[in-house]
Design a protein with these regions (language model features):
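Bacterial N-terminal signal peptides
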Residues: 11-23
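Hydrophobic membrane-targeting signal helices
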Residues: 21-26, 495
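Extracellular/periplasmic carbohydrate-active domains that bind, remodel
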Residues: 29-533
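N-terminal secretory signal peptides that target proteins for export/translocation
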Residues: 1-8
């Protein structure tokens, strides 16, 4: 489903003018450069790159303006953006990314290859009602590239086929361009357009500031498009993503703090609102490649449908994730083919060392575990196929995680070759955890390994207030809530929908054969027989 573009012809020009005025530019002298006046034919088979680049340079030489791309089909390699120049790709115009790797400029870093390339530019925009098509191609063959990981090992154990999608000609070909790459750009607006079939991350930004993505439709194949993310923000700040529909094979939106294109920088001050996301990987990912930190992120009023994973907050290189709010969401998870990460779970929090993430022995000099602190999740309705997990690290516990007004429903996936789900949600190595008005339910038929609605292990300072739910198998004495090695817990205003509501294992301090009330408190509002030790 495509959102209606919010920019229309004259509105685009007004917005571009406003952008340039904000940069101190005099609109009376703004140039308007039509690419056909510079030699573009509008025929797909012709190379439009020289003409479009000439139009960009002419606008820049005039002090800024708008490059008009009228209806037609245009094929191009790398286009270098210039400060105070906007592109208006009109309705009926399609700009194709050249399939020739030699058509892309990237200096010494192949991962900078892109159709639109801008480095150290300001006051730029890419907008309109047209289409940008990356023409990505894929091929299916037996997996002979990835090292063994959980899903692959399971498939091998089950004797299942390891056929999977690869970018065409990988690894002989090493240039897979983005549709947009921006580095250290400021005052950027990308709006209204359809971005389709990117061979790599659709939008890749490094160290950019004051960026606005508005009313975009981004699509890559949910079956095949490995690596083809939607929007990747690396060390960026003051970014707004609004009113966008993003359907991608790989992750829809990524936050990261890496050193691929320069020093690792904090990614911060980002809002995502009024969007619709679908992905064979993750809807929103706080990437494990985080070396410094990701903070002050708000995702709200967003629908995640047909996603393998809803939200993943992961750190493996020592970086931190702080001050995150995820609110007013609907999440509908499904499993995808075995080579996609995920098991149909709405939430995954994970702190590991890199060696642990790679299932390897500890490495000399590797970064210590990072941290995840102060994350609020509220007003969510989620359907899941797999277990949500909130896992800190024995050396770095999650801190200040809260769930409020959350409904979670787990359902079976009979077609899946494997199903690893156990508890609906499990948390381990965490402190100061709050669950308020959380409800968990299960669809029939229940899977034999399903267990408790909530499982808490190695937790200090747990508040469970207003929980409603049951274990998957009450006839097996499966508790609704399982506590293991939990201290400082308070349960109030909670009710179980079966006989066995809450089971405690090693949750109290034992004194003389009796459990100390200091470690666990179940208030009178908890239903009779709720605590079983």
């Amino acid at each position: 489903m495509n959102l209606r573009p919010l920019w229309r012809g004259s509105s685009l020009r007004l917005l571009l003018t406003g952008l340039l005025v904000g940069a101190g530019f005099d609109p009376a002298g703004a140039a308007a450069c039509n690419v056909k006046d510079f030699g573009a034919t509008g025929k797909k088979g012709d190379d439009a790159r020289p003409a479009i680049q000439k139009a960009i340079e002419a606008c820049a030489a005039s002090g800024g303006g708008t490059v008009e791309v009228p209806p037609g089909e245009y094929t191009s390699g790398t286009l270098h953006l210039r400060s105070r120049v906007g592109l208006n790709i009109q309705a009926g115009a399609t700009l194709f990314a050249s399939p020739d790797p030699k058509a892309y400029d990237f200096g010494k870093i192949p991962s900078k290859a892109a159709l639109f390339f801008g480095e150290d530019v300001e006051d730029v925009s890419i907008g309109g009602q047209g289409t940008v098509d990356g023409q990505a191609e894929y091929e299916w063959r037996l997996d002979d590239h990835e090292r063994g990981f959980d899903h692959k090992t399971l498939m091998e154990t089950l004797g299942k086929s390891l056929m999977r999608s690869f970018p065409k000609d990988f690894p002989k070909r090493d240039i897979f361009p983005h549709l947009v790459w921006l580095g250290r750009a400021k005052n950027v607006r990308v709006s209204g357009l359809r971005f389709l079939h990117s061979p790599s991350w659709t939008m890749a930004l490094y160290a950019c500031e004051r960026v606005n993505f508005e009313g975009l439709y981004i699509y890559t194949s949910l079956r095949e498009a490995v690596w083809a993310d939607g929007i990747d923000l690396d060390g960026c700040k003051d970014v707004r993503i609004a009113n966008c529909t993003i359907e991608t094979g790989d992750d829809c939106i990524i936050f990261i703090s890496a050193d691929t294109w320069g020093p690792a920088l904090v990614c911060e001050n980002v809002t995502v609102t009024n969007c619709r996301l679908s992905s064979a990987s993750a809807g929103v990912k706080f990437s494990e490649g985080n070396k410094v930190g990701i903070r002050k992120i708000l995702v709200t009023n967003t629908v995640l449908t047909n996603v393998n994973r809803g939200f993943i907050l992961s750190t493996t290189l020592g970086g931190y994730i702080n001050d995150v709010v995820l609110s007013d969401l609907t999440i509908d998870c499904n499993r995808f083919d075995w080579f996609w990460s995920g098991d149909g779970q709405p939430f995954t929090f994970r702190i590991t060392r890199l060696s642990e993430f790679n299932h390897e022995a500890p490495q000399p000099g590797e970064a210590p575990p990072g941290s995840i602190r102060n994350v609020q999740i509220r007003t969510v309705v989620a359907r899941a196929k797999g277990s949500s997990s909130l896992h800190g690290h024995a050396e770095s516990w999650l801190d200040g995680i809260s769930f409020e007004n959350v409904k979670l429903r787990l359902s079976a996936d009979p077609a899946a070759p494997y199903d690893k789900a156990e508890h609906a949600l499990e948390a381990r190595w965490a402190k100061n955890v709050k669950f308020r008005n959380v409800e968990v339910s299960w669809d029939k038929p229940e899977i034999k390994q399903w267990k408790s609605a909530l499982c808490f292990e190695d937790i200090t300072g747990l508040q469970l207030d207003g929980f409603a739910g049951r274990g998957a198998w009450p006839e097996r004495d499966t508790p609704a809530v399982l506590l293991k090695e939990v201290s400082g817990a308070v349960v109030r205003h909670s009710r179980a929908l079966d006989v066995v509501s809450l089971q405690v294992e090693d949750a109290f301090s034992q004194r003389g054969g009796h459990y100390s009330r200091a470690a666990f408190l179940a208030e009178a509002s908890v239903s009779r027989g709720a605590v079983r030790a």
